[in-house]
UniProtKB/Swiss-Prot annotation:
Residues spanning the membrane: 500-517, 540-560, 586-606, 621-641, 665-685, 799-819, 825-845
Function per UniProt: Polymerizes chitin, a structural polymer of the cell wall and septum, by transferring the sugar moiety of UDP-GlcNAc to the non-reducing end of the growing chitin polymer.
Enzyme class name: transferase
Domain of life: Eukaryota
Name under which the protein is recorded: Chitin synthase 2
Pfam families tied to this protein: Chitin_synth_1, Chitin_synth_1N
UniProt keywords, alphabetically: Cell membrane, Cell wall biogenesis/degradation, Glycosyltransferase, Membrane, Transferase, Transmembrane, Transmembrane helix
EC assignment: 2.4.1.16
Gene name as annotated: CHS2
Record membrane topology: Multi-pass membrane protein
């Protein structure tokens, strides 16, 4: 018999044996010995082996003589090609090719049934809840270093039948409080249908970070047993949506077993399946298994929550924050999207920021675009442009906002929050309350502004943290922490992603500016509140600038290309690249192409999905890039000619050169902008994107303004996440149940009229009904149709306001008959260029201050 062990954490028994035996299913009392003495071990399925470990040697005792189909052999597997080892050295057993068989079939092998023999047991409910302690496979346990302790020998399954907010009050608990452990880091990995490679990339990266925490033996918090203070929570959005190969990786980690979960418990439908286990293995993206004790792998406490239904990412965060958070009571919560790979020490650096400054409520690291092996992904101009965009945001934008203390968005792909700061007040009002409003007000009965705003609910959470009543929390950027993620490499995916980003950020930005007074109800110092006001002014200017970006970009193109011809005011360059008539012809042709492209964007955005218009959108981006090349040529030529003219007329005096509008507006403003890009990149010791991605970003910048903005604004009515559907079954027509008749065939019972008088009565009723005169009914729209009409009418009004305001700006500047001011085109071009330069100076100043503060605060 098995030796007597410690008492279980609760009055519970395993759901079933892990041994395969010839014993028939029997009913057992919970007070009988669950493991009979005469039942031998016969589970010889090997665990995936690691290159660092030789294959496990399994016992060679023969199977029971009455085991069905058991051959009289002494080895678990017959030798193949005179190789007695069941697996090839250094190669995981699951990936070794099987010996050829005369009965070989081709194609994908069918999925193995989870159990061939099951034992039915009586299981006591724990406080009315189904909780099962299931032994892990013996093959797994034989291949790991730690074999004692229930967290290593048993996987704990809980069938949750409650809403996340009722998890603790309904009597559910988790292993950490039962083991008396204090959790310092609670890491959540949100998942939908990502494949096994993306999941392993993230999970293996997290486990490498946990291993790094265990190497910090001089820390007061961490050390060799630091893994006991970290819990990794994996939340998968929908049981029918999860990738099956990802489930196989989870099963390999020991945290998932097939055939355990149940749909209904005591008449209540299960809302989430919760699996808990402390794994001792890790699977890297190459599907190689690393065991505890090897490099970068230590035990890891995993909490796997498999939601029964697909209910969006924000609902996954409800399970993390509302259900599991209060039970575990962590210090810091880290949010990571599956597919994002954290750097080897990134989680430690995030945690250290909270440890140094007790006023930090949230922090984020750098989000990097995956460039592939030796940067091969940057050969795709779409990836390169996004790489440049991400880099400059992390070098200029995030440091500036961190200096102010308010970061407009902590990216959900890789960020961290202090659990204490997230909590609501005694009345239930606070950051989490506003954050989770997005689940009920997104779509549903929400107004269109709120629905779009909650497309970027993480921005709402950031503002609510900073403006929390009677608190003084700030947000911080940690440049030494980073997470790598895949970016869209196809035009249709890129446009669809940016639609939600642009609409969510626009409406969330309006929300933050509209509620600027909330900051004055916080407990921040007067200086900090004034800094927030300065940041609000900066954000307001950016918001207005982005609203008129469509008109501003066209005006810049119009004025610069017109200057190579006869000019907006009729003047010509002193040294043009070609004759004024040729320049005027080129300007006219390119101008018409620009206008046609804009019209095409509106037509496609209002009626086509990007997935159905890939060629059209790709072609549009190519044409806009060609227009950008001509515009840059015009800008460079005007700059060179302007410098020569100014030097000749001013005698080389810099003061006199500054008095020339051409020199000021074009040369100084543009050079200042791009020089600051280079200088700031070198200051952060990360300049390579300026050489590998800058040109691609410049060429695609017209598409950012014209393609992405138009598609986003024209689809503000679309606030769906694509996860809702009709999952109910109508029963108004009756339910047909099949039964076997006397001959053993299936038959059904249905109710149909058979009496002649009933049939005739129905016929007469139909005749009478047609003789009646009815009043014409007024058509009524149902609630869903009314909401869709309201959303579309809002979209129409918004797009009209956007088009009219930008068109009015273009007409006022480009048409001399509307406003006849001498040199107005040059004046407005100077305003645009100096605005860009001024915003760049502010960002550069903030970036420099961030580096200075980092020297003293770490």
């Amino acid at each position: 018999m098995y030796p007597e062990g410690p008492k279980p954490e609760h009055d519970q028994f395993p759901l079933q044996d892990t041994q395969f035996s010839n014993q028939p299913p029997v009913h057992r009392s919970p007070f009988e010995d669950p493991y009979p003495e005469d039942q031998p071990h016969f589970d010889k399925q090997p665990l995936l082996t690691s290159p660092a470990y030789p294959p496990t040697q399994y016992p060679t005792s023969p199977p029971p003589p009455n085991f069905p189909g058991s051959p009289a052999v002494q080895q678990p597997y017959p030798p193949f090609n005179n190789n007695p080892s069941p697996v090839s050295p250094g190669v995981p057993a699951y990936f070794n090719p099987a010996p050829p068989s005369p009965n070989m079939h081709y194609g994908q092998a069918p999925r193995r049934q989870p159990r061939r023999f099951k034992t039915t047991r009586q299981v006591k409910l724990t406080k009315g809840n189904l909780v099962l302690d299931c032994p892990v496979p013996t093959a797994y346990l034989n291949d790991v270093p730690i074999k004692d302790g229930k967290e290593f020998t048993h996987m704990r399954y809980t069938a949750a039948t409650c809403d996340p907010k009722d998890f603790a009050s309904d009597g559910y608990t988790l292993r950490q409080p039962m083991l008396g452990r204090k959790t310092e880091l609670f890491i959540v990995l949100t998942m939908y249908n990502e494949d096994e490679v993306l999941f392993a990339r993230t999970m293996h990266g997290v486990m490498k970070n946990i291993a790094h925490l265990c190497t910090r033996d001089r820390s007061r918090t961490w050390g060799p047993n630091g893994w006991e203070k970290v819990v990794v929570c994996i939340v998968s959005d929908g049981r029918n949506k999860i990738n099956q190969r990802t489930l196989s990786v989870l099963a390999l980690l020991g945290v998932y077993q097939d055939g355990i979960a149940k749909n209904v418990v005591h008449g209540k439908p299960v809302t989430a399946h919760i699996y808990e286990y402390t794994t001792q293995v890790s699977v890297d993206p190459n599907m190689e298994v690393k065991k505890a004790g090897s490099k970068n792998v230590v035990p890891c406490q995993i909490l796997f929550c498999l939601k029964e239904k697909n209910q969006k990412k924000i609902n996954s965060h409800r399970w993390f924050f509302q259900a599991f958070g209060p039970v575990i009571d962590p210090h810091i919560c880290v949010l990571i999207d599956v597919g994002t790979k954290p750097g080897g020490t990134s989680i430690y650096h995030l945690w250290k920021a909270f440890d140094i400054n007790s006023n930090i409520a949230g922090a984020c690291g750098e989000i990097r675009a995956m460039a592939g092996t030796r940067g091969v992904a940057l050969l795709n101009p779409l990836v390169a442009a996004q790489n440049f965009e991400y880099k400059m945001s992390n070098i200029l934008d995030k440091p500036l906002e961190s200096v102010f203390g308010y970061i407009s968005v902590l990216p959900g792909a890789f960020s961290a929050y202090r659990f204490k700061a997230l909590q609501n007040d005694v009345n239930g009002h606070g950051p989490l309350e506003k954050y989770f409003l997005g689940e009920t007000q997104h779509g549903g009965d929400a107004d269109i502004f709120t629905a779009n705003m909650y497309l970027a609910e993480d921005r709402i959470l950031c503002y609510e943290l900073v403006a929390k009543k009677e608190a003084h929390w700030v947000l911080h950027y940690v440049s030494s922490s980073y997470g790598e993620t895949d970016v869209p490499d196809k035009v249709d995916e890129f446009i669809s992603q940016r639609r939600r980003w642009l609409n969510g950020s626009f409406f969330a930005g309006v929300y933050a500016l509209y509620h600027w007074r909330k900051v004055w109800q916080s407990d921040h110092s007067y200086l900090r509140k004034m800094m927030f006001m300065v940041e609000d002014i900066y954000n307001t200017y950016n918001l207005i600038f982005s609203w008129f970006a469509l008109g501003n970009f066209y005006l810049t193109f119009f004025i610069l290309t017109k200057a190579l011809g006869h000019g907006v005011d009729g003047s010509t360059l002193t040294d043009p690249p070609f004759s004024p008539d040729t320049g005027e012809t080129l300007h006219t042709v390119f101008n018409y192409i620009y206008i046609v492209l804009i019209v095409i964007q509106f037509i496609m955005a209002l009626g086509n999905r990007p997935q159905g218009s890939k060629i059209a959108y790709t072609s549009s981006m190519v044409f806009f890039a060609i227009l950008m090349v001509y515009m840059m040529f015009a800008a460079i030529w005007i700059t060179v000619v302007g410098v020569k003219t100014v030097v000749e007329t001013s005698g080389g005096q810099f003061i006199e050169m500054l008095e020339q509008s051409t020199f000021r507006n074009i040369i100084i403003s543009l050079c200042a902008t791009y020089v600051m890009y280079f200088v700031s990149s070198f200051m952060f010791l990360d300049p390579w994107h300026m050489f590998t991605s800058f040109i691609q970003y410049i060429l695609l910048s017209p598409s950012y303004t014209n393609v992405l903005n138009i598609y986003a604004f024209c689809n503000t009515h679309d606030v769906s996440w694509g996860t809702k559907g009709d999952n109910t079954v109508a029963t108004d027509l009756g339910v047909v149940k099949a039964k076997k008749d006397g001959s053993g065939d299936l038959a059904v019972e249905v109710e149909v009229p058979v009496e002649e008088k009933d049939i005739n009565a129905a016929f007469i009723d139909a005749q009478v009904e047609l003789t009646k005169k009815i009043e014409p009914e007024k058509s009524h729209r149902d609630a869903k149709t009314k909401q869709e009409d309201y959303y579309r009418s809002f979209r129409t009004r918004l797009v009209l306001a956007w088009i009219i305001s930008n068109l009015a700006l273009v007409v006022a500047i480009a048409n001399t008959t509307v406003i006849d001011i001498k040199g107005k085109a040059s004046i407005y071009l100077g305003f645009i260029l100096w605005s860009v330069a001024g915003l760049s100076v502010i960002r550069f100043t903030g970036s420099t201050l961030y580096l200075i503060f980092k020297i003293f605060t770490g």
